[in-house]
C-alpha cells in the first residue's frame, strides 16, 4: 500500500504561511487568541455606550479520507457588530446581529446551524445567514457571571477535543439561552443551556436544546512549577416537543457526552519560552432515549503530549474508542459515519498530530494558522445489510488560516 502523502494544495498553503511568521517573544495559543470571544463587561464602564465589532475571517481546507466524514472546504467570515450599554457597573446590555458568509455562496439554508448546514431548497436567505443578537450580562460578585440571551459559547467553554471541535467556530450559530460562570483560584465552572430549535404549534420539526457543564479544577499551588488541571465535562442534547403533533418525526431523543481527565503544563528553564504539556481524558456516550443512533453506550480514551515554543504549539496524540459517538466533536473521534449512520466502525484507533501558530497584531486584532493530521488505523466497517469491510489506514489532513478582530469604540459616556 502506498504511503499517504500530504496534498500539494495543503503543502503550498503551509509553506506560504510559515514564511509569514514573524519573530515571536511570548507564548500564545490559537484557541485563546482566535477562537475565544472576550468579555466586554468592564467594572469601570458604567454609563458607556459602545460599538463593538467582532469578526472571524477564515480559510480552512479539510482533505479527509476517513470512513467517518468526507472532505470539504470552509472559506468565509462571520461578522457580529453590537451596540453595548452599561447602565450599572455590573450589568451590560448588548444588541446587534450575527452574519455568516461563505465565499461563493449566495443562498443560505434558513435554519439553525449546528455544524456545516444541510441544504433546504425552499427556505433560504440571500447574501448572508443572519441572526439577531442580544445579551444581558450580570455580574453580581467578582467571581460570578450570569448571562441571558447570546452566550459566551463555543470555544469559550473549554471542552476537550473529543467532545467539541474548534471548527464549530466557523460554521455554527451563536449559542443562545442562559449561562452561569463561577471562577475561583482552584476551579472554573461554566454551566449553560443552548436553545437550538424552537417549535410552534403543528410545526413540522422537533425542538432541540443542549445542556452543558464544563469544570476545570486546578489543584496545584500557585508557586508550583508544574501546574495540573482536571477537566470534568458533561453535554446533553434533547430533541422532542409536544405541540408539533403533525411532525413526521416525533420520537424523543436524548444523548449524553461526558469526559473526565487530567493535564499538566511544565515551563522549562530556557532562554526562549518553552513549556511541555500533556493531557489524558476518558469520554463517554449514552443514548438516553430514542433509537436514532446505532449505539446505546460507548467510550473513548485520548492521550496527547505537546510542547509550546514561542507562539507555536505542537502536539501528538493517540485515540481509541468503542461505540463512541461525539455530539459536537470532530467526526474522526466517532465510531459511526456522519454521511451514512448505518456504517459503523469496530473499535477504531487513530493517531493525531497538531501544529499551530497564533499572535496578537495589536489591541483587538490577532491571527493564527493550524495544521492537523488524523491517521485512522486499519479498521473493520459494518454496513446496514450486515456485511463487513476491512479498510486500510486512512490519513486525513486539515489546515487553516484565521484573522480575529474585536475592536471596541466608545460612542458616549453618561
Where in this protein do the model-derived segments appear?
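Short loop/turn motifs that connect adjacent beta-strands in outer-membrane beta-barrel proteins
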Residues: 30-49, 85-93, 142-143, 186, ...
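Transmembrane beta-strands of outer-membrane beta-barrel pores
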Residues: 53-61, 97-103, 150-155, 184, ...
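Surface-exposed strand-loop-strand hairpins of Gram-negative outer-membrane beta-barrel proteins
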Residues: 54-78, 108-110, 121-122, 388
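Surface-exposed loop and membrane-interface regions of Gram-negative outer-membrane beta-barrel proteins
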Residues: 91-140, 161-162
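Surface-exposed coil loops of outer-membrane beta-barrel proteins
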Residues: 145-216
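Outer-membrane beta-barrel "beta-signal"
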Residues: 393-414
Amino acid at each position: 500500500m502506498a504511503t499517504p502523502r500530504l496534498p500539494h494544495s495543503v503543502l503550498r498553503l503551509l509553506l506560504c504561511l510559515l514564511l509569514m511568521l514573524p519573530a515571536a517573544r511570548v507564548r500564545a495559543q490559537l484557541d485563546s487568541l482566535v477562537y475565544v470571544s472576550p468579555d466586554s463587561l468592564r467594572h469601570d464602564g458604567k454609563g458607556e455606550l459602545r460599538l463593538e465589532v467582532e469578526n472571524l475571517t477564515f480559510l480552512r481546507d479539510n482533505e479527509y479520507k476517513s470512513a467517518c466524514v468526507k472532505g470539504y472546504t470552509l472559506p468565509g467570515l462571520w461578522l457580529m457588530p453590537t451596540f453595548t450599554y452599561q447602565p450599572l457597573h455590573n450589568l451590560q446590555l448588548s444588541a446587534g446581529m450575527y452574519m455568516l458568509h461563505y465565499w461563493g455562496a449566495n443562498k443560505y439554508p434558513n435554519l439553525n446551524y449546528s455544524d456545516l448546514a444541510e441544504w433546504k431548497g425552499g427556505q433560504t436567505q440571500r447574501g448572508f445567514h443572519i441572526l439577531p443578537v442580544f445579551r444581558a450580562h450580570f455580574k453580581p460578585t467578582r467571581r460570578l457571571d450570569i448571562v441571558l440571551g447570546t452566550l459566551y459559547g463555543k470555544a469559550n467553554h473549554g471542552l476537550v477535543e473529543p467532545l467539541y471541535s474548534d471548527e464549530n467556530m466557523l460554521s455554527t450559530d451563536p449559542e443562545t439561552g442562559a449561562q452561569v460562570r463561577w471562577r475561583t483560584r482552584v476551579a472554573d465552572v461554566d454551566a449553560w443551556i443552548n436553545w437550538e430549535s424552537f417549535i410552534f404549534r403543528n410545526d413540522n420539526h422537533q425542538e432541540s436544546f443542549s445542556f452543558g457543564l464544563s469544570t476545570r479544577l486546578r489543584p496545584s499551588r500557585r508557586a508550583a512549577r508544574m501546574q495540573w488541571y482536571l477537566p470534568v465535562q458533561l453535554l446533553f442534547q434533547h430533541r422532542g416537543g409536544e405541540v408539533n403533533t403533525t411532525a413526521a418525526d416525533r420520537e424523543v431523543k436524548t444523548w449524553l457526552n461526558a469526559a473526565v481527565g487530567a493535564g499538566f503544563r511544565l515551563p522549562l528553564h530556557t532562554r526562549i519560552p518553552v513549556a511541555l504539556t500533556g493531557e489524558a481524558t476518558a469520554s463517554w456516550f449514552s443514548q438516553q432515549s430514542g433509537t436514532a443512533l446505532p449505539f446505546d453506550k460507548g467510550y473513548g480514551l485520548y492521550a496527547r503530549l505537546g510542547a509550546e515554543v514561542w507562539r507555536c504549539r505542537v502536539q501528538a496524540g493517540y485515540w481509541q474508542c468503542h461505540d463512541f459517538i461525539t455530539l459536537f466533536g470532530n467526526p474522526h473521534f466517532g465510531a459511526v459515519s456522519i454521511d451514512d449512520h448505518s456504517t459503523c466502525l469496530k473499535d477504531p484507533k487513530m493517531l493525531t498530530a497538531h501544529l499551530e501558530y497564533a499572535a496578537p497584531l495589536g489591541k483587538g486584532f490577532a491571527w493564527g494558522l493550524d495544521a492537523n493530521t488524523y491517521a485512522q488505523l486499519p479498521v473493520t466497517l459494518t454496513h446496514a445489510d450486515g456485511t463487513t469491510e476491512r479498510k486500510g489506514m486512512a490519513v486525513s489532513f486539515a489546515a487553516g488560516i484565521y484573522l480575529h478582530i474585536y475592536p471596541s469604540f466608545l460612542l458616549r459616556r453618561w
